[in-house]
Each structure stands twice: as structure tokens, then as C-alpha cells.
A protein has these predicted regions:
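Sec-type signal peptide cleavage vicinity
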Residues: 2-8, 19-303
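Hydrophobic alpha-helical targeting segments used for export or membrane insertion
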Residues: 10-15
Length: 303
């Protein structure tokens, strides 16, 4: 599972509970069915780093509904309730369990990708970036009740995206790019994600990457390879990227003058020359490529 575009609306249906003997929506005891809609902040990264404008057919999100200060809402537990998508694009609908709201104030959040094995402690969900899966979270909406049953959640990215725009310079070989890896003192491979607010804990470093690319590099246009990473902050922002080209490994040390933040994309222009790799600048943007650019210094390592 894995994401560059504007907000996409995905309406979730199947939340309306109808009494068997009535054509009207149930309002017994002032209970009103929750109506849910979800927006995705920018793009979604799907499996194998394929970009998509929306959730695909059969995808599921996990929804939590709780009391204002309790895990239960009106005596019922709505923890990690799955809602599944049917159809695609603007015709997509979602179906899941009925959730009835009373006058008591409640709160809710959702996350993606859904896991039926989610830990009871949803503030520490294990994530391993070997799979290069995008994780989305909505944060809490704290204004639910039968007077405010229409719940809109905006899904945000918990990870940062690092994109390499690779092109061929004066390199005379075949220039077939088959893999890219990254490693660094603060580059996390695994960690614990709080799926309610997108925060991270217990981050452990390690190499992340993608293989089997089969990309033919050319002078123009540059070919993009994107990797997902746990956000990096503090002084240890430098990392090494290693590009496997024509069966050889070309390393280069990279960095940025600001933190690698969740929901942002950091685009490096990389040129393959006869003596190795060179970097031009890093462009820091939102997931949708609208942002600021800054020039950085990079230590070049030749093979």
C-alpha cells in the first residue's frame, strides 16, 4: 500500500440505518445516524509507489468513535470499525457498520491503511518502511452529536516523501537504473505511529529503498523515483543515497537545511556523469509540488 494532487472527496455511504418497517431514517430516542465524508489532503501513495487520485476498489479505512472523555460512546464501542470502498473516482461509495449518535458529544478519527490486527494501543502502531506504504490519519474531530451528525475528516500524510529526479549527463554507459536505497544516522526504517494524530515514537534507523525499477535514464526529461520516509528533525538530517545503475552502485551524500516534515516532498535533481553523481538543488514542496525551493550543498562521492 502506498501518493501529487488536490483534495479528493470520497463520500462514504452505508452508514444510514433504516428500520425494517419504515421508509424514514431512524431517529428513535433522538438517535441520529452518523454521516461520514472523507477528504484526502493531496495525493495518496498506493502499493509499489504507484500514484493514485483516490482510494482503489476494495480499500478499507479504520474509524474510531468515542465519547468526549471516554473510550465508549453511549455504552457502545466503535474501535477500528472498517469501512470499505466500492467503485472508483467520483462514483465511489463506502459501506460499514451503523453508528448512531445521541445528544452526547463524541469525537472521531480515521486512519489508512486498515488493519484488523491493529494494536489495542492505537498510539503505538508498528510501521516498517520496507513495504513503502503510505500512512494517512485524520486527527480528532471533536464535534459529533445527533445535532451535528455529518462528520468530515481530512486525511493527512504521516510520512515525508523524498523524490530523486535522475537524468543522464555525460555518462557513456547504458544508464539503466534498477534500484535506489537511503540510509542515515536519523533515517528511520521502523517506528511506532499514533494513528490518531500522526506522531511517531520508538523510531529505529535502517536502510530503506526500492529495487527492480528498470528505468532507462536519459538527458531529458529526468526520471522520478520517490521513497517514503519517517519525518526527520534535528541536526542529523544528512543521509546517503545509493543508486544502482548498470549493475554498479553510485553513492551520494545529501541533506537539507530544514527538517523533513510529514506531508512534504523533497525533490533532488541528480545527474549521472562519467565521474559519478552530482546534485543541483533540493526543492521543498507540499505533496502537490507547490512550495519553496532552496539550494543546498551536497558532498559528492565518486565510485
Amino acid at each position: 500500500m502506498r501518493n501529487t494532487l488536490g483534495k479528493k472527496w470520497i463520500c462514504l455511504s452505508g452508514l444510514v440505518f433504516c428500520l425494517a418497517c419504515s421508509d424514514e431514517i431512524a431517529h428513535e430516542g433522538n438517535m441520529t445516524p452518523l454521516s461520514l465524508a472523507v477528504t484526502i489532503e493531496n495525493d495518496l501513495e498506493t502499493k509499489a509507489l504507484v500514484e493514485s487520485t483516490s482510494f482503489g476498489e476494495g480499500e478499507r479505512i479504520g474509524l474510531f468513535v468515542q465519547g468526549a472523555s471516554t473510550v465508549e460512546y453511549e455504552g457502545s464501542t466503535y474501535q477500528n470499525v472498517p469501512y470499505q470502498s466500492y467503485g472508483t473516482s467520483t462514483s465511489q461509495t463506502w459501506q460499514g457498520a451503523t453508528i448512531l449518535l445521541s445528544s452526547a458529544m463524541g469525537r472521531a478519527f480515521a486512519y489508512w491503511p486498515y488493519s484488523d490486527g491493529l494494536p489495542a494501543d492505537y498510539t503505538k502502531v508498528p510501521v516498517d518502511l520496507t513495504t513503502q506504504t503510505d500512512w494517512l490519519y485524520s486527527g480528532w474531530n471533536v464535534s459529533l452529536s445527533n445535532k451535528q451528525p455529518n462528520l468530515t475528516l481530512t486525511m493527512n500524510h504521516a510520512l515525508t516523501a523524498i523524490e530523486f529526479d535522475v537524468k543522464r549527463g555525460d555518462y557513456t554507459g547504458t544508464a539503466q537504473l534498477t534500484g535506489v536505497t537511503m540510509s542515515g544516522a536519523a533515517l528511520g526504517k521502523t517506528g511506532k505511529l499514533n494513528v490518531s494524530d500522526g506522531s511517531w515514537s520508538e523510531v529505529a534507523t535502517g536502510m530503506i529503498g526500492v529495487s527492480g525499477l528498470g528505468i532507462q535514464l536519459q538527458t531529458s526529461p529526468a526520471m522520478a523515483v520517490k521513497l517514503l520516509a519517517i519525518p526527520i528533525s534535528g541536526a542529523e538530517r544528512a543521509f546517503e543515497a545509493r543508486f544502482t545503475i548498470d549493475g554498479k552502485v553510485f553513492p551520494i551524500s545529501l541533506g537539507c537545511t530544514e527538517d523533513y516534515a510529514a506531508g512534504k516532498k523533497y525533490m533532488y535533481t541528480i545527474t549521472l556523469n562519467g565521474q559519478g553523481l552530482s546534485v543541483g538543488e533540493v526543492t521543498v514542496t507540499g505533496w502537490t509540488n507547490s512550495g519553496i525551493s532552496e539550494t543546498i550543498d551536497a558532498e559528492i562521492e565518486n565510485i
